[in-house]
Curated annotation (Swiss-Prot):
It comes from the Eukaryota. PANTHER family: PHOSPHORIBOSYLFORMYLGLYCINAMIDINE SYNTHASE (PTHR10099:SF1). This is Phosphoribosylformylglycinamidine synthase. Pathway: Purine metabolism; IMP biosynthesis via de novo pathway; 5-amino-1-(5-phospho-D-ribosyl)imidazole from N(2)-formyl-N(1)-(5-phospho-D-ribosyl)glycinamide: step 1/2. One of its GO terms (molecular function) is phosphoribosylformylglycinamidine synthase activity. One of its GO terms (biological process) is purine nucleotide biosynthetic process. The active site is at 1187 (nucleophile), 1319, 1321. ATP binds at residues 345-356, 424-426, 719, 932. One of its GO terms (cellular component) is cytoplasm. It is found in: Cytoplasm. Transmembrane segments: none annotated. Keywords: Acetylation, ATP-binding, Cytoplasm, Glutamine amidotransferase, Ligase, Magnesium, Metal-binding, Nucleotide-binding, Purine biosynthesis. InterPro entries: Class_I_gatase-like, FGAR-AT_N, FGAR-AT_PurM_N-like, PurL_large, PurL_linker, PurM-like_C_dom, PurM-like_C_sf, PurM-like_N_sf.
Length: 1358
């Protein structure tokens, strides 16, 4: 067996290199220690044969050629790095002041990258030649003369270079390749001797020591319970596996002990537990809830008739089955892992919540997501704000700035790669000093951050409940990724205050994500569910906190069974793990299932087709006993009666007292001017633009997103609600679902009940921007974050839960069927601590009648006499409360009087009014935006920003304090744009629902002739403030811009920021050279005969559903074809007239975006011949590729005739994944090339918006300038990015990737192949377009203009 070392491409772009130099310099307390840095990947190849043949070596080199090569011809340092890597030289061989640092996967492990790269190599014919391929990173660093770099590096300074959980660092010598590929011997089983011979130590002393060393977080009662079970009942010592499993299964994180505790407050025993009060909401309003509190997510009856659109299990033809599809809802938090390791912590937070939505009932599926973050003050270097506090942090916990740079990327990356659109969220910062009731200073803030991940999904009605029992003998299966020693003890670690435990235990508790694996698992679940009555899944759970130690026992416990397991059947990437580590690690992307032995072969076939790993690890038993055997070590790690594990350790009792903070009233005399207040408030992150958090996340995948965060022709992120269409199917469906968030944690410093009520009310005011069916249809998820053990916080928690469970929610008729709690929201280190306020995050979910009736803050320009109307639900209050407002926060105040819901009936009447306003035939409401963070002024400004217009804002006169109160109070309310002629109708509907005229007032009007914002004293008509829309919007966008500049390429951040000032920018537009209405007739004409199109996907592809639907709507028969189908002969391309390569992340973009997929075609003889014949020999075929499919086709250019000068698609100039709506033009070249295209016939010259979502879309011509020239001369570019003026552009963000000459789509000379980076298939439903002109829904029949592309192909076929 021979090992090879091959230098790879550049690992870091110049922008990333500059950032890394800056980071390492800062950690070494210098600005100029490092002069230069070069980077590359290293490929380690473990050969099977003694020596690879020359042909095999060349193939291997081709496979491992991707991204940008080192410039060894012109750069001496790059050449030195390449030679040192190729020859495996130590750092000392490079000369003085030059260091070579290598990072490789941790010894004895197999990385996810390795699994995918090895898989590609095997598909390409190297299965008998190459055992495994691994990848490392090499950094060549040149310092100033004489600086001892290695002496100044430590774990903290190197965290920007490697992940010590999964990787190893080599600072001087190169790693021995044997250590990379050699597996360690399994570690032994450990017994904890609770009955030692040394009688000086009691069993409790010994268990207490193990409790600390293992990070079990057991309380005294639980330790007594375990001692009784093992010492007194079983009369034996427990194993470390049994103790660790018990700790995870019974942790606060998993069992919610505080919410089930008995409470005594101020000496009075309380009548209800917290959970009982939450359940009360469901008890009083159970309508439309199918499942609550009993599964991984709550299941709702949406009452929306829809289609189950999926491939037929036999023919693989995409078919529509008409059925009502229940909605499932879930919101999770991943706070502790995000504090420790922000990127993987947030990534696995989203991944875990996605699995919850996939493991509901007997198999389900996520549909769309949300994410949110609360952190302490950002302290952006060079952009520190006057109210921000810098109080330090524990050394091993990430700063707020690092969290907000890395964590959103982690969450977005997982969602993107899995294929889940993220269309809602929030972002808040807080660090403030307050005095407790004794006058002692406390720091309140989010050093322990909140990372929230949630969303909703769907489940077929027959599988909504876990009502098919697992029976004795059922196969117990682990589906998904192989286990590794990561995420150990996450359930227990997240149940204690951060910073209290050991840094090593904290770090060990963070999982790592592999979204492409989770996508494969979801495909398995989808295929099982598509079998209908033959679904082999009896029951399913996701593997989360506690790993298999929680999931597998829970699976059988649900069915009152026991189980017997073989621990060595658990698939592992790390054979050296001990039994405890195998059983308890929290490796991600895993599900546990029960499958009948008779159905095992069906399940196995599905997994094989999807390349999803699985193992039968045990069987259910009638005896309620949990036995885990280890045949390798010949031990029994677990032998427990199920009641011991799931029995009843002593029920928790909580005693607390009511203690209010000592808060002074608001002091507005400290505020120098209205201008200063506006400037500061616009810079507060909770108020300002969240664009930097949104553009990194795909918001168009599935083709069902009818309202995302960005609004209008100028794409400003101000939407109140996220909305999806119900389903794809035979026809356009107008129904849908909505979700919206509400959270008011700062108010909890003043009043817990007010904070809770405001959070619910805010979520409702947001969700009612959508055409919600009724209040009873709305269901809430409540996520409670509390430092429950902090003095006075227990009573606040009880007060808040009581306010919702026994008061507001019953009064409104809304239920809370799902939720989560995190009860350790405190960070401690040294002699410092930062305590979070009680934070209730409410997410409202509801079915929607008509998604096209969703209101947005975009002001309607087609009316001359509209006014802006405020409905102020606090109108009867003599004074407005400024407590906990953004205004006070930016002047380091909290205040002592909070807004609240003063009258439940008025709020309910207002919400009923919104339902009726939506139902009016005439659009009475032209625009809508609720009043929230920042108050009335921010509500109005956001409407102006979205609309690129001016405003005249009228407020009552008075002094500065009066002006500040009117403009910045955050009392409940909303602003409506109403035409003057409809004002009386609007008022009448509100009055009839109990909202009297005193609640309604005109506060201004829009000005579409100017972009000046004026605030006018309505008493004197004096202008008391004036500024331009562009300057105010830039101030509002400043935090987002600064974060984007730190995280992404600063040049593109600056270009986008500058574009805000272009007052003449006309925005998105539809300048079409064809009439989309004609396509309705074409669709009917072509639907009788349906030629077959292969909807082609490789592992990791996620955009097949919307692609299949578009071809179906165009008159084709769409067939689900995987690469394994072609490799194994289940399908042949001869069977199809068309081929559509779908978007996603094939092989997780390992070996380059689309490259692994393409190489599996080019270097597999049988498959290559199929594709070659399809492109070259047949004249009746066409091929289309979008995004990843475009990258795939572009790399097949050698077998597509005339396409040798096609570009490749490389990393975006922004160095970031970009999800945007961009304008493109269908090229109208001198040779009329677009008219030759099978797809673009009749569209030439059209300019229109399209969805974009990719990280590697820059068209790059690597051979020479002549390649680009020849490409353009041959007319092979058929789609180009244009700016809003219609000019071809390379400017960001109008060109989202920096593509040369604006290249967005390319075609073959014969017009039969089209490859494009944007996504037409995602916007063929008109509502899936973020914006379209008024009146087009009826005119175009619900279809978007891009449906023409697919119907043109159908006409070409004839």
């Amino acid at each position: 067996m021979t090992d090879y070392i091959l230098p790879g491409p550049k690992a870091l772009s110049q922008f990333r290199v500059d950032n890394l130099i800056k980071d390492i310099n800062s950690y070494t307390n210098s600005t100029s220690v490092i002069n230069e840095l070069r980077s590359c990947y290293i490929h380690y190849v473990n050969g099977i044969a003694q020596n690879l043949s020359e042909q095999d070596t060349k193939l291997l080199e081709v496979l491992l050629t991707y991204d940008s090569a080192l410039d060894i011809a012109n750069d001496p340092l790059a050449r030195q790095l390449n030679d040192a890597v190729a020859n495996n030289l130590p750092s000392s061989a490079l000369g003085e002041d030059t260091y070579l640092i290598r990072v490789v996967p941790r010894s004895g492990t197999i990385s996810p990258w390795s699994s995918k790269a090895t898989n590609i190599a095997h598909v390409c014919g190297l299965q008998d030649k190459v055992q495994r391929i691994e990848r490392g990173l090499a950094l060549l660093i040149k310092t100033v003369p004489g600086f001892p770099l290695l002496e100044n590096l430590n774990d903290i300074s190197l965290k920007c270079v490697y992940d010590r959980m999964t990787q190893q660092l080599y600072l001087t010598e190169p790693p021995n390749t044997m250590s990379i590929f050699t597996h360690e011997e399994p570690k032994p089983l450990v017994h904890v001797p609770l009955t030692p011979k040394d009688t000086k130590q009691s069993p409790k002393d010994i268990l207490s020591k193990a409790n600390t060393e293992l990070g079990l977080a057991l309380d005294s009662g639980e330790m007594e319970y375990l001692i009784h079970a093992f010492v007194e009942t079983m009369k034996r010592d427990p194993t470390d596996v049994e103790l660790f499993m018990f700790a995870q299964v019974n942790s606060e994180h998993c069992r919610h002990k505080i919410f089930n505790a008995d409470w005594t407050i101020d000496g009075i025993k309380q009548q209800f537990t917290l959970f009982q009060m939450i359940r009360n909401t469901h008890k009083l309003n159970p309508e439309y809830t199918i499942s609550a509190y009993s599964d991984n997510a709550a299941v709702l009856d949406s009452e929306n008739d829809a289609f189950f659109f999926a491939p037929n299990s036999t023919t693989k033809e995409w078919t529509s089955t008409k059925e009502r599809i229940p909605l499932l809802i879930k919101v999770e938090t991943h706070n502790h892992p995000t504090a420790v390791s922000p990127f993987p912590g947030a990534a696995t937070g989203s991944g875990g919540e996605i699995r919850d939505e996939g493991a509901t009932g007997r198999g389900s599926k996520t549909k769309c997501g949300l994410s949110g973050f609360s952190v302490s003050d950002l302290l952006i270097p060079g952009n520190e704000q006057p109210w921000e506090l810098n109080i330090g942090k524990p050394y091993h916990i990430a700063s707020a700035l690092d969290i907000m740079i890395e964590a959103p990327l982690g969450s977005a990356a997982f969602n993107n790669e899995f294929g889940r659109p993220c269309i809602n969220g929030y972002f808040r910062t807080l660090t403030t000093k307050v005095l407790n009731h004794q006058g002692k200073e406390e720091i309140r803030g989010f050093h322990k951050p909140i990372m929230i991940a949630g969303g909703f999904g769907t489940v077929r009605p027959q599988f909504a409940l876990k009502n098919t029992p697992i029976t004795p003998g059922s196969c117990l299966i682990v589906l998904g990724g192989q286990s590794m020693l990561i995420g150990l003890g996450g359930g227990a670690a997240s149940s204690v205050a951060s910073g209290e435990g050991s840094a090593d235990l904290d770090f060990a508790s963070v999982q790592r994500g592999n979204p492409e694996m989770e996508r494969r698992c979801q495909q398995v679940i989808d295929a099982c569910v598509a079998l209908g009555n033959n679904n082999p899944i009896q029951s399913i759970h996701d593997v989360g906190a506690g790993g298999l130690s929680n999931a597998l026992p829970e699976l059988v416990h649900d069915n009152d069974l026991g189980a017997k397991f073989d621990i060595r059947k658990v698939l592992s990437l790390e054979p050296g793990m001990s039994p405890m580590e195998i059983w308890c690690n929290e490796s991600q992307e895993r599900y546990v299932l029960g499958v009948s032995p008779q159905d095992l072969s069906i399940f196995e076939e599905i997994c094989k087709r999807e390349r999803a790993p699985f193992a039968v690890v045990g069987h259910a038993t009638a005896e309620q006993k949990l036995i885990v055997e280890d045949p390798l070590l010949k031990t029994t790690p677990i032998d427990l009666e199920m009641p011991i594990l799931f029995g009843k350790p002593p029920k928790m009792s909580r005693e607390t007292i009511t203690e209010a903070l000592n808060l002074p009233e608001a002091n507005l005399s400290e505020i120098p001017s209205l201008q200063d207040a506006i400037q500061r408030v616009l810079n507060l992150p909770s108020v300002g633009s969240k664009s930097f958090l949104i553009t990194i996340g795909d918001r168009s995948v599935t083709g069902l997103i009818d309202r995302d965060q960005f609004v209008g022709p100028w794409q400003v992120p101000v939407a109140d609600v996220g909305v999806t269409g119900t389903s794809l199917g035979e026809t356009i469906i107008s129904t849908g679902e909505a979700m919206a968030m509400g959270e008011k944690p700062v108010n909890a410093l003043i009043s817990a009940s007010a904070s809770a009520k405001l959070s619910v009310a805010e979520s409702l005011l947001n969700i009612f921007a959508a055409d919600v069916k009724s209040l009873n249809h709305i269901k809430l998820s409540a996520n409670w974050m509390s430092p429950a053990s902090h003095q006075g916080e227990g009573s606040k928690l009880y007060e808040a839960v009581q306010a919702l469970g026994l008061d507001l929610c019953p009064a409104l008729g809304v239920a809370i069927p799902v939720g989560k709690d995190s009860m350790s929201m405190k960070m401690k280190w040294d002699d410092k601590e930062v305590t979070a306020p009680l934070s209730l995050n409410i997410t409202a979910f509801a079915p929607v009648f008509n998604t096209s009736k969703t209101w947005t803050p975009l002001l309607n320009r087609n009316t001359d006499d509209s006014v802006l109307v405020l409905v102020d639900l606090s109108a009867k209050q003599e004074t407005k409360s400024l407590g906990a407002s953004a205004l006070l926060q930016v002047y380091n105040q909290v205040g002592n009087k909070s807004p609240t819901v003063y009258d439940n009936a008025i709020l309910k009447g207002f919400l009923e009014s919104l339902i009726q306003l939506h139902q009016q035939k005439e659009d009475i409401v032209l625009a809508y935006h609720d009043r929230s963070d920042g108050g009335l002024l921010i509500t109005l400004l956001e409407m102006a920003f979205a609309s690129r217009c001016g405003l005249e804002i009228n407020i009552d006169g008075g002094d500065l304090e009066s002006q500040l109160t009117n403009l910045f109070n955050e009392e409940l309310g909303a602003v409506f744009q109403i035409s003057a002629k409809n004002l009386s109708k609007f008022e009448k509907i509100l009055n009839e629902n109990g909202v009297a005229k005193e609640y309604i007032s005109i506060v201004g009007k829009p000005s579409f002739q100017s972009q000046e914002i004026k605030i006018i004293n309505s008493t004197t008509n004096d202008v008391i403030y004036a500024n331009s829309r562009s300057e105010l919007e830039q101030t509002w966008s400043k935090t987002s811009y600064e974060m984007q500049k730190l995280r992404d390429n600063p040049k593109t951040a600056e270009e986008e920021f500058a574009s805000i000032t272009d007052d003449r920018d006309p925005g998105l537009q539809y300048a079409l050279t064809y009439n989309p209405a004609d396509d309705m007739k074409i669709g009917l004409e072509l639907s009788s005969q349906r030629p077959k199109v292969a909807i082609l996907r490789e592992q990791g592809v996620n955009g097949q559903m919307e692609m299949a639907w578009c071809f179906q709507q165009a008159g084709f028969n769409s067939v689900d074809v995987t690469m394994t189908d072609l490799l194994e002969g289940r399908f042949h391309l001869d069977d199809f007239i068309g081929l559509a390569a779908c978007g996603g992340f094939s092989y997780g973009d390992v070996l380059g975006a689309g490259a692994g997929w393409a190489k599996s075609v080019l270097y597999h003889e049988g498959v290559r011949s199929q594709f070659s014949k399809f492109f070259n020999e047949r004249q009746d075929t066409f091929a289309f590729g979008a995004c990843n499919g475009c990258q795939f086709l572009s790399r097949l250019k050698d077998i597509i005739p005339g396409c040798e000068n096609w570009p490749s698609f490389e990393r975006n100039v922004s160095e970031q994944y970009e999800a945007r709506v961009c304008m493109v033009q269908i090229s109208q070249e001198k040779d009329n090339s677009s008219e030759e295209s099978v797809f673009l016939n009749g569209m030439a010259g059209s300019k229109l918006p399209i969805a974009v979502a990719h990280g590697e879309g820059k068209a790059t011509f690597s051979k020479s300038a002549e390649q680009l020239e020849k490409f353009e001369k041959d007319g092979l570019c058929c789609i180009r990015y244009v700016d809003n003026y219609g000019n071809v552009t390379e400017r960001f963000p109008f060109n989202p990737n920096g593509s040369t000459n604006g290249i967005a789509g390319i075609k073959s000379p014969n017009g039969r192949v089209l490859a494009m980076m944007p996504h037409p298939e995602r916007v063929c439903r008109l509502e899936a377009n973020s914006w379209y002109p008024e009146g087009k829904y009826e005119e175009w029949g619900g279809y978007g203009p891009w449906i023409r592309l697919f119907r043109s192909a159908r006409r070409w076929v004839g």
